[in-house]
Structures are given as structure tokens and as C-alpha cells.
């Protein structure tokens, strides 16, 4: 379950990890979809499952202030989902040259993916059931978050 033909790996079945991090790279929400599901389909789920964050003064807030995303999320409904939740969005535009300004913020997520894939159980999916693989993914995210506490 939650596997589909991977467009990168010659059509072999695979799955895709989705993650939302804070500015330090600590994972806040993780998700799992089939490899052939587009990234933008998972954005609303990820935004709905964000935990309440604390601001600098220690008061809990209901949502993050800003969202940085790559060109895979450049669709009107992704921007509307952020606006409806009062989140400022900085999404790279499709068809335009890649901006180094947004890259300063997005490398944090790529580093977090590298931290997740240090756990070899997540690098290659051995589990048949998606709930078990998602449990390992959540456990790895919790261990990464625990390391920074």
C-alpha cells in the first residue's frame, strides 16, 4: 500500500517522504505517499497536522509565520491553502530561473532528509505495509527532534 510506479526509478514501485521542518531543520510533520503522487497533493494534510509552535516570548501560536517551498508547490490551490491558514508563502515559480535567495532556506529541508535517510530502514523501503513504514519515519523524526532538545 502507498506505493506507485516511481517516475525516476524505471517504473518500480516506491514511496515518497514528505516533511515540514522549522528553520533549524527539526521535523514537525512527516508524511508518506506513493511515488507517483504529486507533492502539492500533500500540502493541505501537512499544514493541517502542524503542531502549535512557540514564538520568541514562549506564547503558543497556532501556525507558523512563513512557508518556503520549491517549484513542485507552485499551484494556486497551494497558495490559497497557505493564505487560508494565515501563513505567508514563498514558493518558487515554475518556468523561471532558480533563485538562490530561496535556496538559502530550502537547504535546511534537504539536510533534514539526509538526517532521516541515515536511518537505513528508511532509505530502502522493506515493509509492505504503509503504516509500519510511516511509524519508522515518525520514529526517526522524533529521534532527530530529541537530539536537538
Labelled PLM ranges:
Residues 76-80, 85, 89, 99-149:
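Basic, amphipathic alpha-helical segments enriched in Lys/Arg and hydrophobic/aromatic residues
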